[in-house]
Regions:
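Structured functional modules or segments
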Residues: 3-79
Length: 79
């Protein structure tokens, strides 16, 4: 069953392949819109990936040093 765009909104994904260099949150944490959750290094640039809205972190699927593919789910959020 497809949950459509709702599923995408409740996850933070890697925009490109890269290496996770910082994890700035943990499950159960309350985060605000635009708060950085994970920092990804790709093509020698550090890219902070931010929460799309105020939320509670449901799960963190990566650790510092992990290599991830583009589109990989890094963090799951609950509104």
């Amino acid at each position: 069953s497809s949950s459509g765009e709702r599923a995408e909104q409740s996850t933070v994904t890697a925009p490109m392949p890269g290496t996770v260099i910082k994890v700035l949150t943990e499950p159960g944490a309350h985060v605000t819109a635009r708060q950085p959750l994970v920092v990804l290094e790709a093509m020698k640039m550090e890219t902070p990936l931010v929460s799309p809205y105020d939320a509670t972190v449901r799960a963190v699927h990566v650790a510092e040093g992990d290599r991830v593919a583009g589109g990989a789910v890094l963090v799951e959020l609950d509104e």
